[in-house]
Curated annotation (Swiss-Prot):
It comes from Escherichia coli (strain K12). InterPro entries: HGLS, YdcJ_bac-like. It comes from the Bacteria. SMART domains: DUF1338. It catalyses: 2-oxoadipate + O2 = (R)-2-hydroxyglutarate + CO2. This is 2-oxoadipate dioxygenase/decarboxylase. GO terms for molecular function: dioxygenase activity; metal ion binding. Catalyzes the decarboxylation and hydroxylation of 2-oxoadipate (2OA) to form D-2-hydroxyglutarate (D-2-HGA). The keyword Oxidoreductase applies. Its cofactor is Fe(2+). Fe(2+) binds at residues 68, 224, 290.
Length: 447
Protein backbone atom coordinates (compact mmCIF):
# COMPACT_ATOMS: atom_id res chain seq x y z
CA UNK A 1 0.00 0.00 0.00
CA UNK A 2 1.10 3.61 -0.61
CA UNK A 3 2.80 5.56 2.23
CA UNK A 4 3.05 2.43 4.36
CA UNK A 5 5.15 2.50 7.54
CA UNK A 6 7.82 -0.19 7.89
CA UNK A 7 7.69 -2.91 10.55
CA UNK A 8 10.98 -1.52 11.96
CA UNK A 9 9.38 1.90 12.48
CA UNK A 10 6.31 0.41 14.17
CA UNK A 11 8.51 -1.74 16.45
CA UNK A 12 10.58 1.30 17.39
CA UNK A 13 7.48 3.35 18.23
CA UNK A 14 6.01 0.49 20.24
CA UNK A 15 9.16 -0.23 22.27
CA UNK A 16 9.51 3.48 23.11
CA UNK A 17 5.84 3.71 24.13
CA UNK A 18 6.13 0.57 26.27
CA UNK A 19 9.27 1.88 27.98
CA UNK A 20 7.54 5.18 28.79
CA UNK A 21 4.47 3.36 30.14
CA UNK A 22 6.53 0.99 32.30
CA UNK A 23 8.54 3.90 33.69
CA UNK A 24 5.28 5.48 34.90
CA UNK A 25 4.03 2.18 36.35
CA UNK A 26 7.32 1.11 37.99
CA UNK A 27 9.41 4.20 38.90
CA UNK A 28 12.39 2.01 39.92
CA UNK A 29 12.69 1.02 36.25
CA UNK A 30 13.55 4.66 35.47
CA UNK A 31 16.28 4.56 38.15
CA UNK A 32 17.58 1.34 36.60
CA UNK A 33 17.75 2.94 33.13
CA UNK A 34 19.83 5.82 34.52
CA UNK A 35 22.18 3.43 36.34
CA UNK A 36 22.68 1.26 33.22
CA UNK A 37 23.29 4.34 31.03
CA UNK A 38 25.92 5.65 33.50
CA UNK A 39 27.69 2.27 33.69
CA UNK A 40 27.68 1.85 29.89
CA UNK A 41 29.13 5.34 29.41
CA UNK A 42 31.91 4.64 31.93
CA UNK A 43 32.74 1.29 30.27
CA UNK A 44 33.00 2.89 26.81
CA UNK A 45 35.08 5.83 28.10
CA UNK A 46 37.52 3.45 29.80
CA UNK A 47 37.69 1.06 26.87
CA UNK A 48 38.20 2.89 23.54
CA UNK A 49 38.91 -0.43 21.82
CA UNK A 50 35.47 -1.78 22.79
CA UNK A 51 33.89 1.50 21.67
CA UNK A 52 35.54 1.20 18.25
CA UNK A 53 34.55 -2.49 17.91
CA UNK A 54 30.92 -1.70 18.72
CA UNK A 55 30.82 1.17 16.22
CA UNK A 56 32.33 -1.02 13.47
CA UNK A 57 29.87 -3.84 14.20
CA UNK A 58 26.81 -1.51 14.16
CA UNK A 59 26.26 -2.43 17.81
CA UNK A 60 26.59 0.97 19.47
CA UNK A 61 23.49 2.65 18.07
CA UNK A 62 21.22 -0.15 19.28
CA UNK A 63 22.66 -0.26 22.82
CA UNK A 64 20.63 2.60 24.29
CA UNK A 65 17.33 1.54 22.69
CA UNK A 66 17.77 -2.16 23.41
CA UNK A 67 15.09 -3.71 25.61
CA UNK A 68 13.39 -7.00 26.15
CA UNK A 69 10.04 -7.42 27.80
CA UNK A 70 8.32 -10.45 29.29
CA UNK A 71 4.64 -11.35 29.33
CA UNK A 72 2.53 -14.38 30.27
CA UNK A 73 -0.72 -15.40 28.60
CA UNK A 74 -3.39 -17.91 29.52
CA UNK A 75 -4.84 -19.36 26.30
CA UNK A 76 -3.86 -20.56 22.84
CA UNK A 77 -6.08 -17.86 21.30
CA UNK A 78 -4.23 -15.12 23.21
CA UNK A 79 -0.87 -16.50 22.06
CA UNK A 80 -1.96 -16.80 18.42
CA UNK A 81 -3.31 -13.22 18.41
CA UNK A 82 -0.04 -11.95 19.90
CA UNK A 83 1.79 -13.69 17.04
CA UNK A 84 -0.28 -11.64 14.56
CA UNK A 85 0.33 -8.45 16.57
CA UNK A 86 4.10 -8.92 16.79
CA UNK A 87 4.34 -9.83 13.08
CA UNK A 88 3.20 -6.26 12.31
CA UNK A 89 6.29 -5.09 14.23
CA UNK A 90 8.61 -7.46 12.34
CA UNK A 91 8.94 -9.80 15.35
CA UNK A 92 8.77 -13.57 14.93
CA UNK A 93 8.77 -16.52 17.38
CA UNK A 94 12.28 -17.90 17.90
CA UNK A 95 13.02 -21.04 19.99
CA UNK A 96 10.96 -23.09 22.40
CA UNK A 97 11.61 -22.89 26.14
CA UNK A 98 10.27 -25.43 28.63
CA UNK A 99 10.21 -23.77 32.06
CA UNK A 100 8.43 -26.68 33.71
CA UNK A 101 11.93 -28.11 34.27
CA UNK A 102 12.26 -25.43 36.96
CA UNK A 103 8.82 -26.02 38.42
CA UNK A 104 7.25 -23.08 36.54
CA UNK A 105 4.03 -24.21 34.74
CA UNK A 106 4.63 -22.38 31.45
CA UNK A 107 6.36 -22.85 28.11
CA UNK A 108 7.62 -19.97 26.06
CA UNK A 109 9.08 -18.41 22.94
CA UNK A 110 10.76 -15.08 22.19
CA UNK A 111 9.23 -12.78 19.57
CA UNK A 112 12.04 -10.78 17.97
CA UNK A 113 13.39 -9.32 14.71
CA UNK A 114 15.41 -11.82 12.67
CA UNK A 115 17.26 -9.97 9.91
CA UNK A 116 20.56 -8.09 10.32
CA UNK A 117 19.26 -4.60 9.49
CA UNK A 118 16.23 -4.87 11.80
CA UNK A 119 18.37 -6.15 14.68
CA UNK A 120 20.88 -3.32 14.18
CA UNK A 121 18.09 -0.74 14.25
CA UNK A 122 16.09 -1.98 17.23
CA UNK A 123 16.37 -5.55 18.55
CA UNK A 124 13.27 -5.29 20.79
CA UNK A 125 12.21 -8.76 21.92
CA UNK A 126 9.36 -10.06 24.06
CA UNK A 127 9.74 -13.32 26.00
CA UNK A 128 6.22 -14.73 25.87
CA UNK A 129 5.02 -17.56 28.11
CA UNK A 130 1.85 -19.62 27.81
CA UNK A 131 0.31 -21.00 31.00
CA UNK A 132 0.03 -24.79 30.96
CA UNK A 133 -3.31 -25.46 32.61
CA UNK A 134 -2.70 -29.22 32.28
CA UNK A 135 0.08 -28.88 34.88
CA UNK A 136 -2.41 -27.67 37.53
CA UNK A 137 -2.97 -30.86 39.53
CA UNK A 138 -6.20 -29.80 41.26
CA UNK A 139 -8.91 -30.54 38.65
CA UNK A 140 -11.54 -28.19 40.12
CA UNK A 141 -9.01 -25.35 40.20
CA UNK A 142 -7.88 -26.17 36.65
CA UNK A 143 -11.45 -25.92 35.36
CA UNK A 144 -12.03 -22.71 37.33
CA UNK A 145 -8.89 -21.11 35.81
CA UNK A 146 -9.95 -22.16 32.29
CA UNK A 147 -13.42 -20.66 32.84
CA UNK A 148 -11.99 -17.32 34.09
CA UNK A 149 -9.63 -17.12 31.10
CA UNK A 150 -12.48 -17.91 28.67
CA UNK A 151 -14.36 -14.84 29.85
CA UNK A 152 -11.64 -12.25 29.20
CA UNK A 153 -10.33 -10.53 26.09
CA UNK A 154 -6.86 -9.02 26.52
CA UNK A 155 -7.13 -7.10 23.23
CA UNK A 156 -9.22 -3.96 22.70
CA UNK A 157 -11.96 -4.19 20.03
CA UNK A 158 -10.11 -1.53 17.99
CA UNK A 159 -6.85 -3.49 18.23
CA UNK A 160 -8.59 -6.56 16.80
CA UNK A 161 -10.06 -4.38 14.04
CA UNK A 162 -6.63 -2.97 13.18
CA UNK A 163 -5.13 -6.48 13.01
CA UNK A 164 -7.79 -7.37 10.41
CA UNK A 165 -7.16 -4.14 8.47
CA UNK A 166 -3.40 -4.75 8.39
CA UNK A 167 -3.82 -8.30 7.13
CA UNK A 168 -6.26 -7.18 4.42
CA UNK A 169 -4.23 -4.13 3.30
CA UNK A 170 -0.76 -5.59 3.77
CA UNK A 171 0.41 -2.55 5.73
CA UNK A 172 -0.43 0.56 7.79
CA UNK A 173 -0.19 4.24 6.96
CA UNK A 174 1.27 6.57 9.61
CA UNK A 175 -2.07 7.33 11.30
CA UNK A 176 -3.02 3.65 11.51
CA UNK A 177 0.44 2.74 12.83
CA UNK A 178 0.21 5.32 15.64
CA UNK A 179 -3.28 4.14 16.57
CA UNK A 180 -2.14 0.50 16.47
CA UNK A 181 0.74 1.23 18.87
CA UNK A 182 -1.63 2.88 21.37
CA UNK A 183 -4.23 0.10 21.13
CA UNK A 184 -1.60 -2.67 21.36
CA UNK A 185 -0.12 -1.01 24.44
CA UNK A 186 -3.41 -1.51 26.32
CA UNK A 187 -2.88 -5.29 26.22
CA UNK A 188 0.30 -4.88 28.29
CA UNK A 189 -0.89 -2.20 30.74
CA UNK A 190 -1.04 -2.98 34.47
CA UNK A 191 -4.58 -3.21 35.87
CA UNK A 192 -5.04 -2.71 39.60
CA UNK A 193 -8.45 -4.40 39.59
CA UNK A 194 -8.42 -8.19 39.57
CA UNK A 195 -11.15 -10.08 37.71
CA UNK A 196 -11.70 -12.53 40.60
CA UNK A 197 -12.58 -12.43 44.29
CA UNK A 198 -9.89 -12.80 46.93
CA UNK A 199 -10.79 -16.42 47.70
CA UNK A 200 -10.24 -17.48 44.06
CA UNK A 201 -7.01 -15.48 43.90
CA UNK A 202 -5.69 -17.17 47.07
CA UNK A 203 -6.59 -20.65 45.79
CA UNK A 204 -4.75 -20.06 42.49
CA UNK A 205 -1.87 -18.33 44.28
CA UNK A 206 -1.44 -21.29 46.64
CA UNK A 207 -1.27 -23.66 43.65
CA UNK A 208 1.46 -21.47 42.08
CA UNK A 209 2.00 -17.71 42.33
CA UNK A 210 2.51 -17.43 38.59
CA UNK A 211 -0.90 -19.03 37.89
CA UNK A 212 -2.59 -16.27 39.91
CA UNK A 213 -0.61 -13.65 37.97
CA UNK A 214 -1.74 -15.00 34.60
CA UNK A 215 -5.36 -15.81 35.41
CA UNK A 216 -6.61 -13.11 37.79
CA UNK A 217 -6.13 -9.90 35.78
CA UNK A 218 -7.77 -8.46 32.65
CA UNK A 219 -4.59 -8.22 30.53
CA UNK A 220 -1.14 -9.77 30.13
CA UNK A 221 0.66 -6.93 31.94
CA UNK A 222 4.34 -6.60 31.16
CA UNK A 223 6.12 -8.08 34.17
CA UNK A 224 9.55 -6.70 33.39
CA UNK A 225 11.40 -4.60 30.84
CA UNK A 226 15.13 -5.12 30.55
CA UNK A 227 17.89 -2.71 29.43
CA UNK A 228 21.25 -4.04 28.21
CA UNK A 229 24.45 -3.22 30.08
CA UNK A 230 28.10 -3.65 29.16
CA UNK A 231 29.09 -4.53 32.76
CA UNK A 232 26.47 -6.42 34.75
CA UNK A 233 28.80 -7.01 37.73
CA UNK A 234 29.16 -3.24 38.17
CA UNK A 235 25.40 -2.70 37.90
CA UNK A 236 24.75 -5.48 40.44
CA UNK A 237 27.18 -3.91 42.94
CA UNK A 238 25.72 -0.39 42.46
CA UNK A 239 22.03 -1.30 42.68
CA UNK A 240 21.87 -1.07 46.52
CA UNK A 241 23.38 2.46 46.36
CA UNK A 242 20.37 3.43 44.21
CA UNK A 243 17.91 1.96 46.70
CA UNK A 244 17.36 -1.18 44.62
CA UNK A 245 17.74 -4.66 46.13
CA UNK A 246 19.21 -7.07 43.55
CA UNK A 247 18.53 -10.81 43.43
CA UNK A 248 21.28 -12.85 45.07
CA UNK A 249 22.92 -14.42 41.99
CA UNK A 250 23.76 -13.16 38.50
CA UNK A 251 22.37 -15.83 36.16
CA UNK A 252 24.29 -17.31 33.23
CA UNK A 253 28.00 -17.65 32.43
CA UNK A 254 30.82 -16.02 34.45
CA UNK A 255 32.52 -12.71 33.62
CA UNK A 256 34.94 -13.25 30.70
CA UNK A 257 37.26 -11.41 28.30
CA UNK A 258 34.91 -12.47 25.49
CA UNK A 259 31.36 -12.44 26.90
CA UNK A 260 29.20 -15.36 25.76
CA UNK A 261 25.45 -15.78 25.52
CA UNK A 262 23.57 -13.89 28.24
CA UNK A 263 24.03 -12.82 31.86
CA UNK A 264 21.02 -11.55 33.80
CA UNK A 265 20.12 -10.11 37.17
CA UNK A 266 17.01 -8.42 38.54
CA UNK A 267 15.55 -6.54 41.46
CA UNK A 268 12.91 -8.06 43.70
CA UNK A 269 9.30 -8.03 42.54
CA UNK A 270 7.16 -5.18 43.84
CA UNK A 271 4.27 -5.72 46.21
CA UNK A 272 1.41 -3.81 44.59
CA UNK A 273 -2.05 -2.92 45.87
CA UNK A 274 -4.91 -4.62 44.02
CA UNK A 275 -8.69 -4.54 44.26
CA UNK A 276 -10.43 -7.91 44.16
CA UNK A 277 -14.00 -8.36 42.92
CA UNK A 278 -16.28 -6.92 45.60
CA UNK A 279 -13.84 -4.01 46.09
CA UNK A 280 -11.78 -5.84 48.71
CA UNK A 281 -8.20 -4.54 48.86
CA UNK A 282 -5.18 -6.84 48.80
CA UNK A 283 -1.67 -7.13 47.36
CA UNK A 284 -0.06 -8.89 44.40
CA UNK A 285 3.63 -9.47 43.67
CA UNK A 286 4.74 -10.08 40.09
CA UNK A 287 6.46 -7.17 38.38
CA UNK A 288 10.17 -6.55 38.69
CA UNK A 289 13.19 -4.99 37.01
CA UNK A 290 15.86 -6.90 35.14
CA UNK A 291 19.24 -6.12 33.54
CA UNK A 292 21.11 -8.17 30.98
CA UNK A 293 24.57 -8.33 29.42
CA UNK A 294 24.78 -10.01 26.03
CA UNK A 295 27.76 -11.80 24.51
CA UNK A 296 28.53 -13.85 21.41
CA UNK A 297 26.08 -16.48 20.14
CA UNK A 298 27.39 -20.04 20.44
CA UNK A 299 27.25 -22.83 17.86
CA UNK A 300 25.59 -26.14 18.88
CA UNK A 301 29.09 -27.38 19.86
CA UNK A 302 29.73 -24.27 21.98
CA UNK A 303 26.29 -24.44 23.55
CA UNK A 304 26.78 -28.09 24.48
CA UNK A 305 30.05 -27.20 26.23
CA UNK A 306 28.33 -24.29 28.02
CA UNK A 307 25.41 -26.46 29.18
CA UNK A 308 27.75 -29.20 30.43
CA UNK A 309 29.91 -26.75 32.38
CA UNK A 310 26.91 -24.94 33.86
CA UNK A 311 25.41 -28.24 34.99
CA UNK A 312 28.70 -29.19 36.67
CA UNK A 313 29.02 -25.79 38.34
CA UNK A 314 25.74 -25.89 40.29
CA UNK A 315 24.78 -22.75 42.24
CA UNK A 316 26.49 -20.91 45.10
CA UNK A 317 24.91 -19.42 48.23
CA UNK A 318 26.02 -15.86 47.43
CA UNK A 319 27.04 -14.10 44.22
CA UNK A 320 30.77 -13.76 45.01
CA UNK A 321 31.17 -17.48 45.81
CA UNK A 322 28.98 -18.43 42.85
CA UNK A 323 30.94 -16.28 40.36
CA UNK A 324 34.33 -17.50 41.60
CA UNK A 325 33.21 -21.12 41.34
CA UNK A 326 31.77 -20.47 37.85
CA UNK A 327 35.04 -18.91 36.67
CA UNK A 328 36.95 -21.94 37.93
CA UNK A 329 34.56 -24.36 36.20
CA UNK A 330 34.60 -22.38 32.93
CA UNK A 331 38.42 -22.40 32.62
CA UNK A 332 38.01 -25.14 30.01
CA UNK A 333 35.88 -22.84 27.81
CA UNK A 334 38.29 -20.92 25.51
CA UNK A 335 38.25 -17.18 26.25
CA UNK A 336 39.55 -15.61 23.04
CA UNK A 337 37.78 -14.88 19.77
CA UNK A 338 40.57 -16.66 17.86
CA UNK A 339 40.21 -19.93 19.82
CA UNK A 340 36.42 -19.82 19.71
CA UNK A 341 36.54 -19.38 15.91
CA UNK A 342 39.23 -22.04 15.53
CA UNK A 343 37.27 -24.57 17.59
CA UNK A 344 33.90 -23.74 16.02
CA UNK A 345 32.33 -22.66 19.33
CA UNK A 346 30.79 -19.31 18.33
CA UNK A 347 29.24 -17.50 15.36
CA UNK A 348 30.98 -14.55 13.67
CA UNK A 349 30.11 -11.94 11.08
CA UNK A 350 32.90 -11.39 8.50
CA UNK A 351 33.63 -8.06 6.77
CA UNK A 352 36.20 -6.96 4.23
CA UNK A 353 38.50 -4.11 5.26
CA UNK A 354 39.39 -1.44 2.64
CA UNK A 355 42.54 -3.48 2.00
CA UNK A 356 40.40 -6.61 1.59
CA UNK A 357 38.14 -4.79 -0.88
CA UNK A 358 41.24 -3.88 -2.91
CA UNK A 359 42.22 -7.57 -3.04
CA UNK A 360 38.73 -9.01 -3.48
CA UNK A 361 39.80 -10.97 -6.58
CA UNK A 362 42.34 -12.89 -4.45
CA UNK A 363 39.63 -14.14 -2.05
CA UNK A 364 37.88 -17.36 -3.05
CA UNK A 365 34.93 -19.41 -1.79
CA UNK A 366 36.13 -21.94 0.78
CA UNK A 367 39.20 -19.91 1.82
CA UNK A 368 40.12 -20.13 5.52
CA UNK A 369 39.30 -16.66 6.93
CA UNK A 370 42.12 -16.76 9.53
CA UNK A 371 45.09 -15.95 7.19
CA UNK A 372 42.96 -13.17 5.65
CA UNK A 373 42.26 -11.80 9.15
CA UNK A 374 46.00 -11.89 9.96
CA UNK A 375 46.74 -10.13 6.66
CA UNK A 376 44.27 -7.36 7.57
CA UNK A 377 41.90 -8.09 4.70
CA UNK A 378 39.01 -9.45 6.77
CA UNK A 379 37.64 -8.71 10.23
CA UNK A 380 35.54 -11.18 12.22
CA UNK A 381 32.96 -9.68 14.57
CA UNK A 382 31.15 -11.79 17.20
CA UNK A 383 27.44 -12.17 16.42
CA UNK A 384 25.43 -10.99 19.43
CA UNK A 385 23.26 -13.59 21.13
CA UNK A 386 19.66 -12.41 20.65
CA UNK A 387 17.86 -15.16 22.56
CA UNK A 388 17.42 -16.56 26.07
CA UNK A 389 18.67 -19.33 28.36
CA UNK A 390 15.98 -21.55 29.91
CA UNK A 391 17.89 -22.11 33.17
CA UNK A 392 18.52 -18.34 33.57
CA UNK A 393 14.92 -17.46 32.71
CA UNK A 394 13.69 -19.97 35.26
CA UNK A 395 16.12 -18.60 37.86
CA UNK A 396 14.80 -15.06 37.31
CA UNK A 397 11.18 -16.30 37.47
CA UNK A 398 11.83 -18.25 40.67
CA UNK A 399 13.66 -15.49 42.53
CA UNK A 400 10.86 -13.07 41.74
CA UNK A 401 8.26 -15.54 42.90
CA UNK A 402 10.00 -15.54 46.26
CA UNK A 403 12.29 -18.51 45.75
CA UNK A 404 16.06 -18.10 45.26
CA UNK A 405 16.78 -21.83 45.39
CA UNK A 406 16.74 -23.37 41.95
CA UNK A 407 14.93 -26.66 41.60
CA UNK A 408 15.57 -28.38 38.30
CA UNK A 409 14.01 -31.49 36.82
CA UNK A 410 13.63 -33.03 33.38
CA UNK A 411 10.47 -30.98 32.96
CA UNK A 412 7.59 -31.76 30.69
CA UNK A 413 8.40 -30.28 27.28
CA UNK A 414 5.57 -30.09 24.77
CA UNK A 415 6.85 -28.13 21.79
CA UNK A 416 4.22 -29.59 19.48
CA UNK A 417 1.35 -28.39 21.70
CA UNK A 418 2.96 -24.96 22.00
CA UNK A 419 3.38 -24.60 18.22
CA UNK A 420 -0.22 -25.71 17.72
CA UNK A 421 -1.36 -22.96 20.12
CA UNK A 422 0.94 -20.45 18.41
CA UNK A 423 -0.34 -21.33 14.95
CA UNK A 424 3.11 -21.87 13.40
CA UNK A 425 6.46 -23.55 14.10
CA UNK A 426 9.02 -21.58 16.13
CA UNK A 427 12.22 -20.64 14.30
CA UNK A 428 15.52 -22.35 15.13
CA UNK A 429 17.97 -19.88 16.70
CA UNK A 430 21.03 -21.89 15.57
CA UNK A 431 19.83 -21.76 11.97
CA UNK A 432 19.36 -17.97 12.19
CA UNK A 433 22.92 -17.45 13.49
CA UNK A 434 24.36 -19.83 10.89
CA UNK A 435 22.53 -17.98 8.11
CA UNK A 436 23.81 -14.62 9.41
CA UNK A 437 27.41 -15.92 9.38
CA UNK A 438 26.99 -17.42 5.91
CA UNK A 439 25.48 -14.19 4.52
CA UNK A 440 28.53 -12.30 5.76
CA UNK A 441 30.93 -14.85 4.23
CA UNK A 442 29.09 -14.63 0.92
CA UNK A 443 29.45 -10.83 0.91
CA UNK A 444 33.20 -11.27 1.43
CA UNK A 445 33.51 -13.89 -1.32
CA UNK A 446 34.31 -16.63 1.22
CA UNK A 447 31.24 -18.69 0.27
Amino acid sequence: MANSITADEIREQFSQAMSAMYQQEVPQYGTLLELVADVNLAVLENNPQLHEKMVNADELARLNVERHGAIRVGTAQELATLRRMFAIMGMYPVSYYDLSQAGVPVHSTAFRPIDDASLARNPFRVFTSLLRLELIENEILRQKAAEILRQRDIFTPRCRQLLEEYEQQGGFNETQAQEFVQEALETFRWHQSATVDEETYRALHNEHRLIADVVCFPGCHINHLTPRTLDIDRVQSMMPECGIEPKILIEGPPRREVPILLRQTSFKALEETVLFAGQKQGTHTARFGEIEQRGVALTPKGRQLYDDLLRNAGTGQDNLTHQMHLQETFRTFPDSEFLMRQQGLAWFRYRLTPSGEAHRQAIHPGDDPQPLIERGWVVAQPITYEDFLPVSAAGIFQSNLGNETQTRSHGNASREAFEQALGCPVLDEFQLYQEAEERSKRRCGLL
